[in-house]
Amino acid sequence: MSKLWGGRFTEEAEAWVEEFGASISFDQQLVNQDINGSIAHVTMLAKQGIVTKEEAEKIKIGLQYLLEEAKQNKLHFSVEAEDIHLNIEKMLIEKIGEVGGKLHTGRSRNDQVATDMHLYLKEKVEHIMKATKQLQTVLVHQAENNIETIMPGYTHLQRAQPISFAHHILAYFWMLERDVNRYEDSLKRINISPLGAGALAGTTFPIDREYSAELLGFNGIYENSLDAVSDRDFILEFLSNSSMLMMHLSRFCEELILWSSQEFQFIEMSDQYATGSSIMPQKKNPDMAELIRGKTGRVYGNLFSLLTVMKGLPLAYNKDLQEDKEGMFDTVKTVEGCLHIMAGMLETMTVNKEKMGQAVTQDFSNATEIADYLANKGLPFRQAHEIVGKLVLHCTQKGIYLIDVPLATYKEMSALFEGDLYEVLSPYAAVKRRNSAGGTGFEQIEKALEKAKGLVGEIVGIK
C-alpha cells in the first residue's frame, strides 16, 4: 500500500522492516484517545476557518463511526499503516473520501501521539487511584475487626514490642494514601495538552491550542512545542509512582506469605487466592501474594527501561520514543490487576487471633515495658535498659519468661521493683498504654480509623 508520507521515497521497505518499525500491535490500545483527539482537532480547525464547517462535520461523522466500530472491536488494523494514527487516518479516508486527508492539517504525529498518551494516562491514573482507595477500604474493615487483636511488632524480623494488628494494617493504609497523593499530584502534569505543537516548532496555521485543550478536558497547554513532543517525564512519573505503590504491596505480600506459613500461622488465605502442589497433596501455597511480589520487579523494569531510552535523546522527537508505550501499558495492567487481587485476598483472609496472642506471651516483647516502668520511677533509662537486659539473659538461661520471674529476683536487680510490676507485663496492657499520637494504643487506633474512613470516602463514596 502507498504510505501517507511516501512522496519523498522511491523504494518500498521490505516487509520485515515494516514489521520491525510498526507499533500498531500495541498502540492500538490508544484508539479511543486517538479518535477523540482528532474530533477535538477538527472541531478547532473549523472554528478557526482552516477547514469548512461542512468538511469538519463530514470528518467528525466518519470519526464517530470509527469510534463506535472500535468500541465493538470491529476495526481491522494493518502493519502497513504502521501505527494507530495512520491506521485511523487511512480508514477515515476510505470511509469519507479525500476530505479525510484534511484532518491532519496543522498537526503532526509527534503532538498527536503525545496527546493520546496524556489522555490515556489521565484516565488510567484516575482508575488506579480509585482502585487503591477500594483496597484502603478493605484495610479499614480489617482494622475495625482487629483493634484488640494483639500481635508481635517486629524489627529485624525479631519480635520487638506487642502491637495491635489493626495498627499494623493501618500502617499500609497510610502508605497507600501517600501513593494516592502522588498519583493525584501527577495529574497536574498529565492533564496538559501537547496538541498543536506540531512536529517540533508549532505550525503556520492559525490554530487555537487552548480551545483544543478545553474540548479534551485538559487544564492547559504545554508552553514550549519542543518540550511538548520530546519529553516523556509524565510517563516516567507514572512509572515511578507505580513502582512505589508496588513496593508497598510487595512488602505487605511478603508479610502475608510469612504469616500464612506453618511457622507463623497468623492468617490463612482463602482457597480462592491459593494453589496446591502437583506432587505434595498437603500444600496450600500463597501464589497470588507471591505473584504480586514478583510483578513488582516487572514494574521496576518498565521504569528503568524508559529512563534508559530517554537518557541520551537530543531534542526533539526520535523513533526511540516508540519504546515509551509497551511498558506504560504493561504497568497499567499490572497495577490494576495487583490492586484487585490484593483487595480480594485481604478481604477473604482469616485472622488467627489466638496464634497472634500466643506469640506475644511466649517471648520478651514486653521487656521495654519493664524498662519504662523503672524510668517512670526516676531511674535513668540507660540504667533501666541495662537491668532489663540482664533480666532477659537470666530468663534465657533458665528457660523462662519475664512474667515467670519471682518478685524477689526482680528486687535483687533493683529496689524500685514492686508488686505492680506484673500489671505492666500484660501484652494487652502494654498496647493500651502506648497512647501517644500515632501509636498502637486503642484510643489512637480509633482516632486513626475515623480519619481513614473520611479519606477513603473522598473517592469511593463511603460518606
Swiss-Prot record:
Biological-process GO terms, alphabetical: arginine biosynthetic process via ornithine; L-arginine biosynthetic process
Subcellular location: Cytoplasm
Gene3D superfamilies noted in UniProt: Fumarase/aspartase (C-terminal domain), Fumarase/aspartase (Central domain), Fumarase/aspartase (N-terminal domain)
Superkingdom assignment: Bacteria
Top EC class of this enzyme: lyase
Keyword Transcription regulation included in the entry's annotation: no
Pathway: Amino-acid biosynthesis; L-arginine biosynthesis; L-arginine from L-ornithine and carbamoyl phosphate: step 3/3
Alphabetically ordered keywords of this record: Amino-acid biosynthesis, Arginine biosynthesis, Cytoplasm, Lyase
Xref: Pfam families: ASL_C2, Lyase_1
Entry-linked InterPro entries: Arg_succ_lyase_C, Argininosuccinate_lyase, Fumarase/histidase_N, Fumarate_lyase_CS, Fumarate_lyase_fam, Fumarate_lyase_N, L-Aspartase-like
Principal cellular location given in the protein's record: cytoplasm
This protein's record includes keyword Amino-acid biosynthesis: yes
GO CC term, one of those recorded: cytosol
Enzyme Commission number(s) from the entry: 4.3.2.1
GO molecular function: argininosuccinate lyase activity
Reactions accelerated catalytically: 2-(N(omega)-L-arginino)succinate = fumarate + L-arginine
Family: Belongs to the lyase 1 family. Argininosuccinate lyase subfamily.
HAMAP family from the UniProt entry: Arg_succ_lyase
PANTHER family: ARGININOSUCCINATE LYASE
Protein name: Argininosuccinate lyase
Natural source organism: Bacillus thuringiensis subsp. konkukian (strain 97-27)
